[in-house]
């Protein structure tokens, strides 16, 4: 009964957000929204706790560890591999007598609602039409990967990707201080977000570039870490941390993640993958820095979506859950450009297959290589769209 009430409250929150945006004014829209919300949260209720994997077990063990360590006082220890903001929530949930994992799953579902709202905000920056904005919100809530990574595996990747999506919507609106704050929170929740931050330069080419916003990024990050410092956490452990390349090449990587690393058992190609992503991101930002190209907000969102897909494909720190955030950005883009539907389908297939392999293992007969090929196909579609739209702009001029 508790799960039903909480999920019903989150569904009500989703409806209130749509109502506040003025997207449910007609009876037809209300009927469609209620049906989609019933399907989205009904599936979450049915699949809640089904086939927990190693990620869910790790979260449950971490919450139990905090319960034994005295709640928030356990933050001073570096025994757990989770980021500090995530440990804040684990320490908070450990104060409950039981059901800490269930509370963490509710947090994941709340972040998915936030991502749906951020997706419709990105669409709103291009068009005020209600239909594409409504589609963006509802499709994000109905994505299979979002349901799997939230209520099944309790993966926290939706937490930091929610801030990336919010940062994108703020950047498209020119709200640089809020954008910097959202990026800081994303980096605090997962250091992998630091690789996405430079790509946001594609939003600044035709607007006043406020370097002062970087101070906001640092300030927000420090503010998030202050409670951990006050509780006795060493300052060196509050910085974004990555394993060394030597450590990466000495152990297997996430074999359940789509990308180049699913094609090799060991991470001997880790330096190559990192170099490919860095070069690609620099070329993308350099190309989009031209005012004639960067004035198109659709292309800005395309560039960010493409960079997010490349991050999952080439960076060795990404896992099967990381593709969900890029998938959400693609949904927002597809609602603006329906011709990009094949890219969304490929990315959704890759994300769902990777998550199913992560949850059910060998019970899923398709190899993870199919997810890697689908991810590559989505990247190719986005590249072709960038080239095609460039030619269209030239012909129109």
Locate the predicted segments by residue.
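Transmembrane signal-anchor helices characteristic of membrane glycosylation enzymes that use polyprenol
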Residues: 2-6, 11-57, 219-233, 309
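Perimembrane helix-loop-helix junctions
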Residues: 13, 173, 195-219
């Amino acid at each position: 009964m508790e799960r039903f009430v909480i999920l019903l409250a989150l569904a009500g929150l989703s409806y209130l957000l749509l109502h506040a945006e003025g997207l449910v004014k007609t009876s037809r829209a209300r009927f469609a929204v209620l049906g989609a919300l019933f399907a989205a949260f009904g599936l979450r209720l049915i699949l809640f706790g089904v086939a927990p994997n190693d990620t869910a077990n790790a979260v449950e063990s971490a919450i139990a560890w905090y319960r034994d360590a005295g709640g928030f006082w356990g933050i001073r220890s570096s025994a757990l591999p989770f980021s500090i903001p995530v440990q804040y929530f684990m320490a908070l949930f450990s104060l409950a007598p039981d059901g800490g994992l269930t509370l963490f799953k509710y947090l994941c579902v709340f972040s998915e609602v936030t991502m749906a709202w951020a997706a419709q905000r990105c669409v709103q920056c291009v068009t005020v039409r209600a239909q594409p904005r409504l589609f963006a919100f509802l499709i994000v809530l109905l994505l299979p990967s979002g349901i799997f990574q939230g209520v099944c595996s309790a993966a926290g990747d939706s937490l930091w990707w929610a801030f990336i999506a919010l940062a994108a919507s703020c950047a498209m609106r020119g709200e640089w201080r809020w954008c910097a704050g959202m990026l800081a929170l994303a980096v605090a929740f997962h250091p992998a977000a630091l690789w996405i931050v430079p790509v946001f330069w594609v939003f600044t080419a035709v607007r006043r570039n406020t370097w002062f916003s970087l101070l906001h990024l640092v300030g927000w990050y420090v503010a998030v870490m202050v409670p951990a410092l006050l509780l006795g956490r060493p300052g060196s452990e509050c910085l974004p941390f990555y394993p060394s390349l030597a450590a990466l090449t000495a152990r297997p990587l996430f074999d359940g993640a789509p990308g180049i690393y699913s094609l090799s058992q060991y991470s001997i190609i880790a330096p190559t993958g990192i170099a490919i992503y860095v070069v690609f991101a620099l070329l993308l930002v350099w190309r989009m820095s031209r005012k004639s190209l960067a004035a198109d907000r659709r292309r800005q969102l395309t560039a960010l979506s493409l960079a997010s897909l490349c991050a999952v494909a080439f960076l060795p720190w990404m896992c099967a859950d990381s593709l969900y955030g890029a998938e959400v950005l693609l949904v927002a883009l597809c609602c603006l450009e329906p011709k990009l539907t094949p890219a969304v389908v490929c990315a959704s297939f890759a994300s769902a297959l990777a998550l199913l392999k992560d949850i059910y293992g060998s019970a899923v007969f398709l190899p993870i290589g199919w997810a890697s090929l689908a991810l590559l196909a989505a990247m190719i579609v986005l590249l072709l769209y960038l080239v095609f739209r460039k030619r269209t702009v030239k012909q129109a001029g």
